[in-house]
């Protein structure tokens, strides 16, 4: 299929070439950029809606500012695809989120035009402020621009950074990309005129002169003059909150109208003092009818047909773990009216959208605010409710102090369903669920579980619902289950007890999580090589099943622990117990298979697990090495001595 014609975009592969184009050509360039973006993402999948919404803004920023000397920081990075196309990466844009291809987010190692990596929200203003202060300390006249969406403004970190920027009077430009119309809509020509007026040098010079005069007046008149100016600007433009934080507010302006964007950006570029916030209103999915009509469905997309907008969906072998969690929680909530659910802006991603349909008054979406979500859940638990605080593994990191201080130390029975455990594929290291087992199992009294399949997940939801002795978590991966039979309702598991899945005599494989299927496949291969193999499902990283571990150690020659997590997790806890219990004193062979001690780049999950040695081949290879056998399973002969 031929690619769309883009004559102007072809002439502007980098921002310096873009800046050479006359302004009257920029609307056409924006349309070509939008067409190229749609065509590229239709072949790769990815985050489409946010990028479509900032096409004109991206063109305007690179036309007005001297990138990469001037820094543009994209919060989260979902909206950075147009930026990548314009900054020398167009030839690789159809490798987005593929192994060896472009990242789906901004990445410092990828381009000098990406001054700061992103993927988690609300970090851009803090990073930008650091860069702005560094520029000032170095005596450089560099512009630093942080582009942040209104959704990211629900996180307290954004306001912490703005408060600090205002106190420092730093020369920082923040662009608030309001794509949900959640603050205020632009009101046509008058709004654009006022934005251009108040961002200009003349207005700001007069305003500064008036301040100097006012300082010579009695204090009560100074206060009246200041408030009169604030009220007048707030009446026409809004922005009082940002002004209180020390920012000079401009907007709202139409983020799809280059005639409105360009003069405001130029005015702000030429301002020499203080932090400025430009309020830009955009539309997610702009310019592509299917995305405009269903912005939520086009936030993140699979490959799709450009003409119809229909997304390709791979056939599912079983329900997804996320769906199993959602339906299982609904079943438990039917039996217990104390069960409530909390999500931090991810109801669909965590399966709580299903719960919300069944129990709309018992689900709480707190926005992008994981710290608040955890302590909010702790408050619910303190009053006798049973909160399930469902957060992706990678995002739970953002609320760890609250997990420790507000939940664990007080031993409050908050339930933590941890989605996206292990590797997540195309989203790469920023979204991998590598660390939750380690950082939760380190906490006294915290129960830490991992589901090996979808039936086990259903049991763990029931177990968590019934457990009131303290905090409890259970982790599960992205994607579909393995296709096991599902009970209508889960059973309550005995806390700290695993299970034997396959009996053997020589080798023991102890799995924590969904690598269990690979362990079973490895056991078949090992058995074919004459190595009788036991496979056990640990279920719990804390408390450990000491009886099970002792049995595996005493009855086998080799024990291999397998987990979808970083060093310092389940395997480390097992090794600590083996050492303390004296089970290593007789030369017992133990190996721990974890994710490698690196940040693995994006790719297909199966390939990434193979690279990590966590597939059947890697498990078999580890056992052979422990027993000094070659790749065929034959006992390796000692190397003869040579004089």
UniProtKB/Swiss-Prot annotation:
UniProt pathway annotation: Metabolic intermediate biosynthesis; 1-deoxy-D-xylulose 5-phosphate biosynthesis; 1-deoxy-D-xylulose 5-phosphate from D-glyceraldehyde 3-phosphate and pyruvate: step 1/1
SUPFAM superfamilies (UniProt xref): Thiamin diphosphate-binding fold (THDP-binding), TK C-terminal domain-like
Reactions catalysed according to its record: D-glyceraldehyde 3-phosphate + pyruvate + H(+) = 1-deoxy-D-xylulose 5-phosphate + CO2
GO biological process: one example: 1-deoxy-D-xylulose 5-phosphate biosynthetic process
UniProt keyword annotation of Phosphoprotein present: no
EC number: 2.2.1.7
Gene3D superfamilies given in the database record: 3.40.50.920, 3.40.50.970
SMART domains: Transket_pyr (SM00861)
Residues holding thiamine diphosphate: 78, 119-121, 151-152, 179, 288, 370
Cofactor(s) listed in the protein's UniProt record: Mg(2+); thiamine diphosphate
Family: Belongs to the transketolase family. DXPS subfamily.
UniProt name for this protein: 1-deoxy-D-xylulose-5-phosphate synthase
Species whose genome carries this gene: Brucella melitensis biotype 2 (strain ATCC 23457)
Protein's gene: dxs
């Amino acid at each position: 299929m031929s690619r769309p014609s883009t004559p102007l975009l072809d002439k502007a592969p980098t921002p310096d070439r873009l800046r050479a184009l006359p302004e009257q050509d920029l609307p056409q360039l924006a349309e070509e950029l939008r067409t190229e973006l749609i065509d590229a993402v239709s072949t790769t999948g990815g985050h489409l809606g946010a990028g479509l919404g900032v096409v004109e803004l991206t063109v305007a920023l690179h036309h007005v500012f001297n990138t990469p000397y001037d820094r543009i920081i994209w919060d989260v990075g979902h909206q950075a695809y147009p930026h990548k196309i314009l900054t020398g990466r167009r030839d690789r844009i159809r490798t987005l989120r593929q192994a060896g291809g472009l990242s789906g987010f901004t990445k410092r190692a990828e381009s000098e035009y990406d001054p700061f990596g992103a993927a988690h929200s609300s970090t851009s203003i803090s990073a930008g402020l650091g860069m702005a202060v560094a520029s000032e300390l170095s005596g450089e006249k560099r512009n630093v621009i942080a582009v942040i969406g209104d959704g990211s403004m629900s996180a307290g970190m954004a306001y912490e950074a703005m408060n600090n920027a205002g106190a420092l009077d730093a020369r920082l430009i923040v662009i608030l990309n309001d794509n949900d119309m959640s603050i205020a809509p632009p009101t046509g020509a008058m709004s654009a005129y006022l934005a251009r007026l108040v961002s200009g040098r003349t207005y700001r010079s007069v305003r500064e002169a008036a301040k100097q005069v006012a300082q010579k007046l009695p204090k009560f008149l100074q206060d009246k003059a200041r408030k009169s100016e604030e009220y007048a600007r707030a009446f026409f433009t809004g922005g009082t909150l940002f002004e209180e934080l020390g920012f000079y507010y401009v907007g709202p302006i139409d983020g799809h109208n280059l005639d409105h964007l360009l003069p405001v950006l130029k005015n702000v570029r030429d301002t020499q003092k203080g932090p400025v916030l430009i309020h830009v209103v955009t539309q997610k999915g702009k310019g592509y009818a299917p995305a405009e009509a269903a912005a939520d469905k086009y936030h993140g997309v699979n490959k799709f047909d450009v003409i119809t907008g229909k997304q390709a969906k791979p056939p599912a072998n079983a329900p997804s773990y996320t769906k199993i969690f959602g339906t299982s929680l609904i079943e438990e909530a039917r039996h217990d009216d104390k069960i409530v659910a909390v999500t931090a802006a991810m109801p669909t991603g965590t399966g709580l959208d299903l719960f919300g349909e069944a129990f709309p008054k018992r689900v709480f979406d707190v926005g992008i605010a994981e710290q608040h979500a955890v302590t909010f859940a702790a408050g619910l638990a303190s009053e006798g409710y049973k909160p399930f605080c469902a957060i992706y593994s990678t995002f739970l990191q953002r609320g760890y102090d609250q997990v420790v201080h507000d939940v664990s130390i007080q031993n409050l029975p908050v339930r933590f369903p941890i989605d996206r455990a292990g590797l997540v594929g195309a989203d790469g290291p920023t979204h991998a669920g590598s660390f939750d087992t380690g950082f939760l199992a380190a906490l006294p009294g915290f129960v830490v579980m991992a589901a090996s399949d979808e039936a086990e997940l259903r049991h763990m939801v029931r177990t968590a619902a019934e457990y009131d002795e303290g905090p409890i978590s259970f982790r599960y991966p992205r994607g579909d289950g393995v296709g096991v039979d599902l009970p209508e309702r889960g059973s309550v598991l005995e806390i700290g007890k695993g299970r034997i899945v396959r009996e053997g005599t020589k080798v023991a494989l102890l799995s924590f999580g969904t690598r269990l299927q690979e362990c079973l496949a490895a056991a078949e291969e090992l058995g074919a090589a004459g190595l009788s193999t036991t496979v056990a499902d640990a279920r719990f990283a804390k408390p450990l099943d000491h009886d099970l571990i002792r049995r595996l150690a005493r009855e086998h020659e080799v024990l291999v622990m397998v987990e979808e997590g970083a060093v310092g997790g389940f395997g480390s806890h097992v090794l600590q117990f083996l050492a303390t219990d004296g089970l290593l004193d007789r030369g017992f062979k133990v190996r721990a298979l974890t994710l490698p001690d690196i940040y693995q780049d994006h790719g297909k999950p199966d390939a990434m697990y193979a690279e990590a040695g966590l597939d059947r081949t890697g498990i078999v290879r580890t056992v052979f090495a422990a027993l000094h056998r070659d790749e065929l399973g034959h006992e390796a002969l000692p190397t003869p001595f040579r004089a």
